A protein has these predicted regions:
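N-terminal anchoring/assembly modules that precede and organize ATP-driven motor systems
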Residues: 2-108
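NTP-binding/hydrolysis catalytic cores, primarily Walker-type P-loop NTPases
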Residues: 66-70, 363-414
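P-loop NTP-binding catalytic core
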Residues: 100-214
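Residues at the beta-strand->loop junction immediately N-terminal to the Walker
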Residues: 221
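The conserved Walker
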Residues: 224
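Conserved lysine of the Walker
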Residues: 228
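Phosphate-binding/switch region of NTP-binding enzymes
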Residues: 341-379
Length: 414
C-alpha cells in the first residue's frame, strides 16, 4: 500500500490506478503526457475544486499514489508556466484561493487563475517530492537540516525550479509557493556582453576572467533577482576547461564544469562552513559558494588564504556594503576577531574583488567593480581600502574603466 493526495490529506489505496488494467501500468512519461494533454485541452483547468474531484472530472480516475506522483514532472496549476520556456521567470501563489501571479519577460502579471488550498498544498508536496526533501511515505513531514520539523523550505526541483514553500504557522494566512524557473541554457559571457544589451563590457568581462585565472576571489553582490547567479554561471563557463571547480549551494542550480563536483548543503544536512572546509580535501582550484550569509564567510577567506580562491554571491546594494557584510559575517561565530578578519581581507594572500550587478541606467547590468587594496595598516571598523576598477557613468550610460589594478596579480598588466 502507498499514499496519495486526496481531499487535502494522504489516504491509503492500491499502488495501481483504479481504471488501469493490471498489465497496463503507464510509465512516468506516459502519465506526464496524459496530464498535459488533459490540461492543454481544458479538461484540467479548474483549480478550485478538490484534487480528487478535479482529476476524476478529467477522466484520470482518483489520480496516482505519492510514489507515482514523485516520478512525474508535473506541477498542476503551475505546469503551463513551467513549460513556457525562457519567457516566464517567476510564479507566485501567495495563499489559498489567491490568484497565480507570474513574471513574464520581466513584467509581473496576475493570471486571474485562483488555486484552492488543497491544490496549493498539493503543489507544495509535488515540489518537495521532486526535490527529494520529503518521502512518498510521509510527504507532509517537513524537516530542516537539523532534523527538526519546519514550516518553510526552499530548494530546487528538476534542476530548474528554484522554490520556496511555507505553511502555517510560518505563514499564518495559509500555504504559499514561490518558484523561479532557471534557464535551460545558461547565458555565457559573450551573451552578457553582446546579446543582453551589454550587462557588462568586454573589458570588464576579460578582467574578471583573468582575475579568476590568477587566484583572485570574487564577491558578486546584488539584490534578489538582480542576476548574481547568471553572472556567476557565465564566469564559470568561461573558465570551465581550466579549473577543478567545487560548487557549494543550498540546492543544485549552477552549471557544473567537466572537472568539478557539486555539494548540496540542504541534502547533506551540514553547514556551509563545514562544506567549504571539507572541499579543501578534494583539491579544488576554485570554490564556488552559492550565497554567503553567515560564518561560511570566514571559511571562504581561510580557504583563499591557503591558495583556494572562490566565487561567492552576497546580498548587498553596492560593492562596499558587500565587503562590509562579508567582514561582518566572518566574525559571527566568534572564531575570528574583527582584527584578524580585516587582516585577511587586506592581505596579499587573499586578493579580493567585489562586483555589483543591479539596475543602472534603467536596466540590469554590472555597475561597480572594486578591488580591495593590500595594506598592513587597516583597522577593523575603518572603511576598507579599495580601488575602483569600473563604475557606471550615468552621463554616458556606460560601464567605464576608472583605475588600473593595484594588486600584484594584475599590476602593470590590467
Amino acid at each position: 500500500m502507498s499514499e496519495f493526495f486526496m481531499n487535502g490529506h494522504t489516504e491509503k489505496r492500491s499502488e495501481m490506478r483504479v481504471h488501469d488494467p493490471p498489465d497496463a501500468a503507464p510509465t512516468p512519461d506516459e502519465r506526464l503526457a496524459e496530464l498535459r494533454f488533459c490540461q492543454d485541452t481544458g479538461r484540467l483547468s479548474n483549480w478550485q475544486r478538490p484534487v480528487a474531484e478535479t482529476l476524476l472530472r478529467a477522466g484520470l480516475g482518483e489520480g496516482y499514489t505519492a510514489a507515482e506522483w514523485a516520478e512525474v514532472a508535473w506541477y498542476g496549476p503551475l505546469d503551463a508556466w513551467v513549460r513556457a520556456g525562457s519567457r516566464v521567470s517567476d510564479m507566485f501563489i501567495d495563499g489559498p484561493d489567491r490568484t497565480i501571479v507570474v513574471v513574464e519577460e520581466g513584467n509581473r502579471s496576475d493570471t486571474g487563475i485562483r488555486v484552492c488550498d488543497e491544490w496549493l498544498r498539493w503543489t507544495q508536496r509535488q515540489l518537495l517530492l521532486r526535490a527529494g526533501f520529503v518521502t512518498p511515505d510521509d510527504p507532509d513531514d517537513w524537516r530542516g537540516a537539523d532534523g527538526q520539523i519546519v514550516h518553510a523550505l526552499y530548494g530546487t526541483a528538476d534542476r530548474r525550479l528554484r522554490f520556496a514553500v511555507t505553511r502555517p504557522p510560518y505563514a499564518p494566512d495559509g500555504a504559499t509557493v514561490a518558484v523561479r524557473v532557471l534557464p535551460a541554457r545558461w547565458r555565457t559571457i559573450d551573451d552578457l556582453v553582446q546579446h543582453e544589451g551589454g550587462v557588462l563590457s568586454r573589458e570588464a568581462a576579460d578582467l574578471l576572467i583573468e582575475a579568476i585565472r590568477r587566484g583572485v576571489t570574487l564577491l558578486i553582490a546584488g539584490s534578489a533577482g538582480s542576476g548574481k547567479t547568471t553572472l556567476t554561471a557565465a564566469l564559470l563557463q568561461a573558465i570551465a576547461a581550466e579549473k577543478r571547480v567545487i560548487i557549494i549551494e543550498d540546492a543544485r542550480e549552477l552549471p557544473l564544469p567537466p572537472d568539478g563536483m557539486a555539494v548540496e548543503v540542504l541534502r547533506s544536512r551540514s553547514s556551509f562552513a563545514h562544506c567549504v572546509r571539507l572541499t579543501l580535501r578534494q583539491r579544488p582550484d576554485l570554490i564556488v559558494l552559492g550565497e554567503v550569509r553567515g560564518p561560511e564567510a570566514l571559511a571562504m577567506l581561510e580557504a583563499a588564504a591557503t591558495g583556494h580562491p572562490g566565487i561567492c554571491t552576497i546580498h548587498a546594494p553596492d560593492t562596499l556594503t558587500a565587503l562590509r557584510n562579508l567582514e561582518r559575517f566572518a566574525t559571527l561565530n566568534g572564531l575570528a576577531s574583527p582584527g584578524v578578519v580585516r587582516g585577511m581581507m587586506t592581505s596579499g594572500a587573499v586578493p579580493l574583488i567585489a562586483v555589483h550587478i543591479g539596475i543602472y541606467g534603467g536596466r540590469r547590468r554590472v555597475g561597480q567593480i572594486v578591488e580591495v587594496i593590500v595594506t598592513s595598516g587597516s583597522q577593523a571598523g575603518d572603511s576598507l581600502p579599495h580601488n575602483p576598477l569600473f563604475a557606471f557613468n550615468h552621463a554616458t550610460n556606460r560601464l567605464e574603466r576608472k583605475y588600473p589594478v593595484q594588486g600584484a596579480w594584475g599590476k602593470g598588466r590590467l
